Amino acid sequence: MSVPAAAGAARHRRRHVLDLDDFSAQEIDEILETAVSMKEVLGRAIKQVPTLRGKTIVNMFFEESTRTRISFELAGKALSANVVNFTARGSSVEKGESLIDTVRTLQALGADMLVMRHSESGAPYLVAQHFHGSVINAGDGRHAHPTQALLDLFTVRQRLGRIEGLKVVIVGDILHSRVARSDLWGFTRMGALVTLCAPQTLIGPEAFWKATWPDLTITSNLDECVRDADVIMTLRLQKERMEAGLLPSLREYTRFFAITAERVARAAPHCLVMHPGPMNEGVEIMPDVAVSAQSVIEEQVANGVAVRMALLYRLSGE
């Protein structure tokens, strides 16, 4: 069996996926359309097509990951690629080998694509300068997480039928979130109206955001900004921020910024509640909201496989 014909439309010709800042709305649209075809593949009795047979994908994760790593592994295997999972622990990296030397070694071993997560912002960009194949950023420091943003866009469009004109509220630790930055690029590029909501200490100077996204709304009043929202995206509160003195207490944060049923009731009746995971239930989102009919958190996880299949397919040139 092959990939559905719709996925064989004009192919995305870029070599790497490092962030969404240089993606056009048309490029994003093409990826989302390809993901629809890949979701159809995943709905078959045999969830595999031979599209990337003979290709080798190396998942290089220098940070712990469950959703993203497994999602990429499943995506590669569904396309019949050889998937190798690399971890720094026990590798030559622990013996002092540089990142670039490691990449050159993987290249010599025949890797065609690298999927990379790293704690240092910009690490995938550096690797892309030295690797002859394709590099996909699976999250770098607090900089970017483009595939998370793409699966968020896909989930919203699958549920609501469009992205343009929607009111999207992103709540939480904006300042330190790679997801927030990539979601900003994705949702604004596709025509959504985005509001950022966070304590001042977790969002930073308004001028910083407005310089890139002048139409952005920035506030610390969650009760007001969720009114008539189509999408509420809450981010994981990194508890180390409290230790750094950026928050008085978790209880205080939850009081003003947690997604509760009462706050969701202020939003549009069709409002989607989203979270990139992992969640701190009872802190940034209440347990009843996380499993409510309006929550699409599990759908985000499931859709990640189809979206990452679409990216691997389009980058492969097959």
Swiss-Prot record:
Keywords: Pyrimidine biosynthesis, Transferase. L-aspartate binds at K95, R178, R236. It is an enzyme of class 2 (transferase). Pathway: Pyrimidine metabolism; UMP biosynthesis via de novo pathway; (S)-dihydroorotate from bicarbonate: step 2/3. Carbamoyl phosphate binds at R67, T68, R117, H145, Q148, G277, P278. SUPFAM superfamilies: Aspartate/ornithine carbamoyltransferase. Coiled coil: none annotated. It catalyses: carbamoyl phosphate + L-aspartate = N-carbamoyl-L-aspartate + phosphate + H(+). GO terms for molecular function: amino acid binding; aspartate carbamoyltransferase activity. Transmembrane segments: none annotated. GO terms for cellular component: cytosol. It comes from the Bacteria. One of its GO terms (biological process) is 'de novo' pyrimidine nucleobase biosynthetic process. Its EC number is 2.1.3.2. Belongs to the aspartate/ornithine carbamoyltransferase superfamily. ATCase family. Catalyzes the condensation of carbamoyl phosphate and aspartate to form carbamoyl aspartate and inorganic phosphate, the committed step in the de novo pyrimidine nucleotide biosynthesis pathway. Heterododecamer (2C3:3R2) of six catalytic PyrB chains organized as two trimers (C3), and six regulatory PyrI chains organized as three dimers (R2). This is Aspartate carbamoyltransferase catalytic subunit. It comes from Roseiflexus castenholzii (strain DSM 13941 / HLO8). The lineage of its organism: Bacteria, Bacillati, Chloroflexota, Chloroflexia, Chloroflexales.
